[in-house]
Curated annotation (Swiss-Prot):
Residues 10-20, 72-81 have a biased composition (Basic residues). Belongs to the UTP25 family. InterPro entries: P-loop_NTPase, UTP25, UTP25_C, UTP25_NTPase-like. One of its GO terms (cellular component) is small-subunit processome. One of its GO terms (molecular function) is U3 snoRNA binding. Keywords: Nucleus, Ribonucleoprotein, Ribosome biogenesis, rRNA processing. It comes from the Eukaryota. Component of the ribosomal small subunit (SSU) processome composed of at least 40 protein subunits and snoRNA U3. This is U3 small nucleolar RNA-associated protein 25. It holds the Pfam family Utp25_C. It is found in: Nucleus, Nucleolus. Gene3D superfamilies: P-loop containing nucleotide triphosphate hydrolases.
Amino acid sequence: MPFRGGGQKGRGRGSVKRKGPGFTAARVDEVEYAEGLDDDVLSDSDESDQQSGQPYNELLQLLQAKTDSKGPARKKRKTSHQNKEGTEEAENVAEMTAVEEGEETLDAELQQQEPDEEGDLEDGDVDAQEDSDDEESGNEPFESHFSSPDESELSQKIKAASENKWKNAKKELPGGLKIWRAIPDCGQDDVPLLAAMKSMSSVKVKRKLKSAVTERIPSLSGNVQQVSPYIFDYQDVLYGARTTSESADMRDMLAVHATNHVLKTRDRVLKNNARVAKEQDGDLELRDQGFTRPKVLYLLPTRQACVRVVESITRFFQPEQQENKKRFIDAFSASDDPSWEDKPQDFRELFGGNDDDMFRIGLKFTRKTLKFFTQFYTSDLILASPLGLRTIMDQADVKKRDHDFLSSVEVVIVDHTDALLMQNWDHVSYILKHLNLQPKEAHGCDFSRVRTWYLDNNARYVRQLILLSSFITPEINSVFSTHMHNVFGKVKLNPIYNGAIAELPLPVPVKQTFTRFDCLSPTKDPDARFKHFTTTILSTLVRNITTSRNRASAGGTLIFIPSYLDFVRLRNYFATSQQTTNVSFGAISEYTEPREISRARSYFMTGRQSVLLYTERLHHFRRFRIRGVKRIIMYGMPDNPIFWGEIVGFLGLDPAGVVEAAEGGVRALFSKYDALKLERIVGTKRVGNMLREKGGDTFTFM
């Protein structure tokens, strides 16, 4: 059973109840303090490598043998389940395999309904005559990319991409963006960049979408102009400048792209069905489909994010009927928490509404109907959280594990990628590794209709992968280099950063000191960081605390720790080391019980604990405003640059002590492997010198 990650459901409720360690995890000074705490203290405390395919003939023999031995699959009746009420423990094994909020069982979600061949004509599926005027020219991206690519050119590009031979170009764009584009190196002189897209008029959309697209997206603005050309040209895209303000426009644009792709794929298959039936030509060869029906996959962090995507889709695809729409809304949507009015905008967007991170749903498009909760093998589009999808792919019963429904996905859209990092990135990696593998069973496939690049196990070189993230990390960069193989090109767009240090929400200047430590490799970073902290920074901190006459006034040190593993290491050191015997401290993380968090925050504010250890994931899920902070030590810089301003802003929560706190300031550790984080914090112009500077390893900004 896949590990849920973080012990969190949605934004982090229901943390794991763990047995306490064999040592003291916190230490309290016995000093006089007021019983009646400021209400503000507790106001928010309740809150596998790519598998190589078999040769074509062996694949046909294997799948045909399985099909013949089993005989025709029978129809199976869906099993209905009552909706479940109440909160369930995230680690409860039953939750992983049970039905949540009216979803089908795992077996039912994967069960096929015969006939289920991708090309089978279902009543009302598509009206071929209605779209007879939608025939596209050969240079239209859908045609040149999927339907009728130049086989010789495609083969050359696949060979170059498989050998990791890419030619690239980079440029600064209007709006403060940097672009890096790569294409397979087949002897071209240069790597062209596409012009910004001012409107959707140049996009070849299906006629049934055109009027809604024209009405609802009259023009494109901001960074959407720069990203859209590559998305509609079916290139791989890593966009690292996602913002809350442009998220709706980006979501609508992607919804048009995904829906348009589904409709074009289905209409082409069904028109060819009619052609085969009419001509009765045994030599007619029509390669127009994949092994299985699903063509688009969305990976999203929460159910409410799924609702927003579906709302965007139905703005443009407006069928006469939407089957099970009410059931979908009841199970996936919820109202925002009114107590979050003072939370940051990005927090409200991510966690507003239904923040459950365990879901999956299939959508099927027909001419007059959009069907919700369709079984995966009869779905055109799948929306899921990484946890929800992995649960069905990686079941405890090996015989029930299945990922064939991902074998023919042609467009993958991952939104809120940075939020998925805070859940469990291993789930995302697992899913990406299982995309476009050749299926283990036939699933009713007509192999005479399957496109040759599917049969040759080259689908990953044609598939489009789109990632939207507020910032880029090494893990996200790894997806760009490991899973983005699109032979028509791949692009990375990143902002040019001014630096979070210049945008602090404080009335007075704050001393911000950055200390670089040497490290030979990324794997040795944790040990080098720990050694530098305990020998240099902690010794000074302990001396200041233990030699002060007033322990309460000497306290107020917040230690911010991005990694949970580093947090455990530091917490254990504070609890057991002779160096910190006389230092009172508290430690709170994403796994800490709410009551313990409240106690630690109150002890820290009143001076009973001089030091508070605080993790990045806890801040991500709760966005606490910690009072009593007089100085900040960043054991590592946050991935999210917004967090820098919020954490440093703790220094100004007590107006009477803001000047003293500003003098205490911030001290942050970094190594050369923190380059991406450092760029977001200090700015693109400063980061190079700080990483290469030979004259010193300490840098101070006011």
